[in-house]
């Protein structure tokens, strides 16, 4: 019984010693150690962990960095996770220990520096220099050749490399030149409308009413009774003078240069009017009849009464 117990104890003793050697290994302090066996078929196993104080320090630092940087774990890519821990296996296969190099802390520091503006004051951009570069100063030191532009008669003329003295001389010559005379605008000519000569309508001859003359002859008869007998004789006035007066009036009217057609129409109108006046007059007597009447009346007046002859 005791031998078996001692045998078990002797078997367990090297294991405890092996664990102590693993705990005292220097490379495994403060980090998680991954050990790989020399055999190909064997998988990775967790052998030992750091002390509780080291784990708490790492956890507090990680929590502080994550809270200040406000990083989301979902945004971390697969490549960044690969760069966190790089494992370099040792040369000796007997110890079966590995040296691990952690790249997590520099990454956290860089991320804290880059994302500091999320929790604190924003990072100022680098100042932009206002002063021009030396190349621009060199290029601007060479002045451009002066140009002379002249607008003349609707055309634009540009001359290169003109000295200021020449430009001033040209301007003085242009200013001292003869002043442009104002262009006299042609006067608008008045349109002359050739109108027909306005002539007064021909004055119509005055209508002569037939004059009726009454010839009264008083014959005193010396009779026994002493009775005087008045024998008034009414003679019809002659209208022959009216025709002569009308012809004289027509001759006195001014002759107007009218077309032949108007003259002919006017003559026809006057003839018809004269005929109407003559036909309408109630006492129409020819010249011959009027002369005979006058001679007869004169003879009657001059002759003595018939009863005196007896």
UniProtKB/Swiss-Prot annotation:
GO BP annotation list: jasmonic acid and ethylene-dependent systemic resistance; jasmonic acid mediated signaling pathway; response to cold
InterPro entries on file: CCT_CS, TIFY/JAZ, Tify_dom
Q: Coiled-coil segments, which residues? A: none
For this UniProt entry, what is the primary localization, expressed as one broad class? nucleus
Quote the subcellular location field of this record: Nucleus
Tree of life domain: Eukaryota
Q: Where is this motif: Jas?
A: 259-284
GO CC annotation: what is one?
nucleus
Q: Keywords assigned by UniProt?
A: Jasmonic acid signaling pathway, Nucleus, Plant defense, Transcription, Transcription regulation, Ubl conjugation
Segments carrying motif Nuclear localization signal: 261-268
Q: What post-translational modification information does the record give?
A: Ubiquitinated. Targeted for degradation by the SCF(COI1) E3 ubiquitin ligase-proteasome pathway during jasmonate signaling.
Record domain Tify: where? 141-176
Please report what switches on or represses expression of this protein: Up-regulated by wounding and herbivory.
Q: What is known of its domains?
A: The jas domain (259-284) is required for interaction with COI1.
**Subunit description:** Homo- and heterodimer. Interacts with MYC2, AFPH2/NINJA, TIFY10A/JAZ1, TIFY6B/JAZ3, TIFY5A/JAZ8, TIFY9/JAZ10 and TIFY3A/JAZ11. Interacts with RHD6 and RSL1.
**Function per UniProt:** Repressor of jasmonate responses. Interacts with and suppresses RHD6 and RSL1 transcription factor activities to negatively regulate jasmonate-stimulated root hair development.
Q: Which family does it belong to?
A: Belongs to the TIFY/JAZ family.
In its UniProt entry, what is this protein called?
Answer: Protein TIFY 6A
Supply the source organism for this entry.
Arabidopsis thaliana (Mouse-ear cress)
Q: Which lineage ranks, top first, belong to the organism behind this chain?
A: Eukaryota, Viridiplantae, Streptophyta, Embryophyta, Tracheophyta
């Amino acid at each position: 019984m005791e031998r078996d117990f001692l045998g078990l104890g002797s078997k367990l003793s090297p294991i405890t010693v092996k664990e102590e050697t693993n705990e005292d290994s220097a490379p495994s302090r403060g980090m998680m150690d991954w050990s790989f066996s020399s055999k190909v078929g064997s998988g990775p196993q967790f052998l030992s962990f750091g002390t509780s104080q080291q784990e708490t320090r790492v956890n507090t630092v990680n929590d502080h960095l994550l809270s200040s940087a406000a990083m989301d774990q979902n945004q971390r890519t697969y490549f960044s996770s690969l760069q966190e821990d790089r494992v370099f296996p040792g040369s000796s296969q007997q110890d079966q220990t590995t040296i691990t190099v952690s790249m997590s802390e520099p990454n956290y520091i860089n991320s804290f520096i880059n994302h500091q503006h999320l929790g604190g004051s924003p990072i100022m951009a680098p100042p932009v220099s206002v002063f021009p570069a030396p190349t621009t100063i060199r290029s601007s030191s060479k002045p451009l050749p002066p140009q002379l532009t002249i607008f003349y008669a609707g055309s634009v003329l540009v001359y290169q490399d003109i000295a200021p003295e020449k430009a001033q001389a040209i301007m003085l010559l242009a200013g001292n030149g003869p002043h442009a005379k104002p262009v006299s605008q042609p006067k608008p000519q008045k349109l002359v409308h050739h109108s027909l000569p306005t002539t007064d309508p021909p004055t119509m001859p005055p209508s002569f009413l037939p004059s009726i003359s009454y010839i009264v002859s008083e014959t005193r008869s010396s009779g026994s009774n002493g009775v005087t007998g008045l024998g008034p004789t009414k003679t019809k006035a002659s209208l022959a003078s009216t025709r002569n007066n009308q012809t004289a009036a027509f001759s006195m009217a001014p002759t107007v240069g009218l077309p032949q057609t108007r003259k002919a129409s006017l003559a026809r109108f006057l003839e018809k009017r004269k005929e109407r006046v003559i036909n309408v007059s109630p006492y129409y007597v020819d010249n011959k009849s009027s002369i005979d009447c006058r001679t007869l009346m004169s003879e009657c007046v001059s002759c003595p009464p018939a009863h005196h002859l007896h």
